[in-house]
Amino acid sequence: MNHPRKDLLNISSLTDEEIHTLLDSAGPMKELFTKSVKKVPALKGKSVLTLFYEPSTRTRSSFEVAAERLSADVTNFTVSTSSVVKGESVQDTIATLQAMKVDYVIVRHYNSGLPNVIARHTCASVVNAGDGAHAHPSQALLDSFTIREVFPDVRGKRVLIVGDILHSRVARSTSLLMKRLGMEVAFLGPGSLVPRTEHSGIPRFSDFNEAFAWKPDVIYLLRVQKERQDAPFFPSAREYNKIYGVTEERLKRISGEGLYIMHPGPVNRGVEICDLAMDYERCLINRQVENGIACRMSILYHLTPQTQH
């Protein structure tokens, strides 16, 4: 990157050059995984704090492993056992972060925009690991990196995103980045979960038959986010699976057409996807996990915290 970037808060703030730098750098990072020593001293002496206000296993662990492989010191800030539960305000938390003089803060919060607030008031580099239903930039980067591995030229490739678009920060960030890289994106899901006011220009389908006729290259499944739904948006998990899930019957067609399957995790087996599909040779879910570490290493490596006095 020609100009130092302090934070990664969303995809829209990245230039095309920055996007390609982050994706291109993830390749050499991934090559480290095959070495006997999987660490480099790039961030030796730097401190990384994970600040998660929502439960997370995959994203948090991925960032922690990424930081450790760059030789950074990692501190896990567990909100349930922290002062936040005792009434500490966001302003107090920010002041604490400044006093601790950490170099990087990985933050996930249930309120959209909170990572931006922290970034404005701290010298640390802030990475948005998911804020409400707004953005999840590192997931978007790892998804596009994964697709680039199976399609060296992603331009014109078609990605069908299936499920709860309305509540999904993954759908917002991932669809935006895919379109910027020249991919075509379409949505499939219940009308109640596919917003019509957003994502202008993206085709919407109501059933898999329509979607298959669009000739997708990748089926990207989203988790049904019951915790973000104030009221039920579909009758039952069983009904959802029947209409929008990758069932064994649909897997036959997916396999026959050589389509790839992706999912940001965690997976609801029997809802979005059947057990058999998890073992399908073109299921990229485990590769997404591996690539998440490489992409997050690239993100941390390319961010530049402000000097603290």
Swiss-Prot record:
Disulfide bonds: none annotated. NCBIfam families: asp_carb_tr, PRK00856.1. Pathway: Pyrimidine metabolism; UMP biosynthesis via de novo pathway; (S)-dihydroorotate from bicarbonate: step 2/3. One of its GO terms (molecular function) is aspartate carbamoyltransferase activity. The keyword Cytoplasm does not apply. It comes from Akkermansia muciniphila (strain ATCC BAA-835 / DSM 22959 / JCM 33894 / BCRC 81048 / CCUG 64013 / CIP 107961 / Muc). Its EC number is 2.1.3.2. Heterododecamer (2C3:3R2) of six catalytic PyrB chains organized as two trimers (C3), and six regulatory PyrI chains organized as three dimers (R2). Keywords: Pyrimidine biosynthesis, Transferase. One of its GO terms (biological process) is 'de novo' pyrimidine nucleobase biosynthetic process. InterPro entries: Asp/Orn_carbamoyltranf_P-bd (IPR006132), Asp/Orn_carbamoylTrfase (IPR006130), Asp/Orn_carbamoylTrfase_sf (IPR036901), Asp_carbamoyltransf (IPR002082), Asp_carbamoyltransf_Asp/Orn-bd (IPR006131). It is an enzyme of class 2 (transferase). GO terms for cellular component: cytosol. Belongs to the aspartate/ornithine carbamoyltransferase superfamily. ATCase family. It catalyses: carbamoyl phosphate + L-aspartate = N-carbamoyl-L-aspartate + phosphate + H(+). Carbamoyl phosphate binds at R58, T59, R108, H136, Q139, G265, P266. The keyword Ligase does not apply. L-aspartate binds at K86, R169, R223. This is Aspartate carbamoyltransferase catalytic subunit. Catalyzes the condensation of carbamoyl phosphate and aspartate to form carbamoyl aspartate and inorganic phosphate, the committed step in the de novo pyrimidine nucleotide biosynthesis pathway.
